[in-house]
């Protein structure tokens, strides 16, 4: 591990695994840039006018090669940035090293502890005598930390009863920070112009805060941009899920019986991913519409309890809690593979497995012996499998998501007076612009409406082409 601190402050400039990996990281970043036309187009368009000049962004998002391209785009557009990963296993250490080498503050190591995770999240919010004024979040941890910390300033009892290991680490980190600075969280929170949120789970948190009239600043829901949710969540998972399972286990997918729990965009991509390599795929759902979609796609729609003893590969993709419980886990067949591709690690009751013998096979791959004598293979300790056991989504699809992130940061930072403390979605014309920026790369050519055709369907020749409520 490398900790660098060249200025007089308690916060190091960066904390990474190994700075000598920076050359390797830079080579991969250069390749990724060729696959991320949206971000590169924004660099070209805004290199001179610097629309993020003055923005001080606290970023909490997986520290991957693709994220490195995002970070350097934000910096190229004028922003100052501090970055941490939003998952303890998702960092690519060579990507973090390449960013640190450029003098950008990054705090991320693959396999960091929970205590380190929350320390690093504090680091991106602590700018000494200065303060961040924007948050770029993935899962809502940076935003949630400010909110919970502000509550703890007034009432420490909110930290009284942690329910799991993560909350123990989180609560301890807040207590420690309050001993240093009793008004840290409210001070930083008061300086935040807004947050842009990347993923489904984080967006759900924001809408819950809005419903409670507790959202402390405006938020843009990047996840529900069509060019994010219908591309990153669907097509990204379609490629990265089986990549991670095969890297972790070397198992043959063909002929295996797989259960995908959840058939939203992530579940749809996951089911396609497994079926594409020859798995017999079943789906579990609570939503009748999604269940019907799964059935119409040819998947058997089942309940976990009915099939748990017959499944070879379990994949959770719900964004919910305790989807696979201990009662389910102990019934699994020998060598069943269990993994999660939802954002948080509580979809699978991993805590209950701590009572059984564990054998680590390699990083993020564990053999766990059940009371029955059967062994299951748990991937990434129930955290995001595609980032814990592989490198996440391909660069091209992440260019869609991250182009939306940059546009959202520009929008909130420059038009803050137009936004109240609510959750917003980017307008349709920006969604279409993101898609348009990616067509040339894959050789796609758009047909253009004539004026008469546009008038006939009551749209502009240049778009937007669909109403806001249109479901793609």
UniProtKB/Swiss-Prot annotation:
One Gene Ontology molecular-function label: adenosylhomocysteinase activity
Subcellular location: Cytoplasm
Residues binding substrate: 64, 138, 198, 228, 232
EC class (word): hydrolase
Cofactor: NAD(+)
Cofactor note: Binds 1 NAD(+) per subunit.
Keyword ATP-binding: no
Gene3D superfamilies: Adenosylhomocysteinase-like, NAD(P)-binding Rossmann-like Domain
Cellular component terms (Gene Ontology): cytosol
Residues that coordinate or bind NAD(+): 199-201, 233, 262-267, 285, 320, 341-343, 386
Catalyses which reaction(s): S-adenosyl-L-homocysteine + H2O = L-homocysteine + adenosine
Entry's Gene Ontology BP terms: L-homocysteine biosynthetic process; one-carbon metabolic process; S-adenosylmethionine cycle
EC numbers on record: 3.13.2.1
Pathway: Amino-acid biosynthesis; L-homocysteine biosynthesis; L-homocysteine from S-adenosyl-L-homocysteine: step 1/1
Keyword Nucleotidyltransferase (UniProt): no
Entries under SUPFAM superfamilies matching the protein: Formate/glycerate dehydrogenase catalytic domain-like (SSF52283), NAD(P)-binding Rossmann-fold domains (SSF51735)
Keywords noted in UniProt: Cytoplasm, Hydrolase, NAD, One-carbon metabolism
Function, in words: May play a key role in the regulation of the intracellular concentration of adenosylhomocysteine.
Family according to the record: Belongs to the adenosylhomocysteinase family.
Protein name in UniProt: Adenosylhomocysteinase
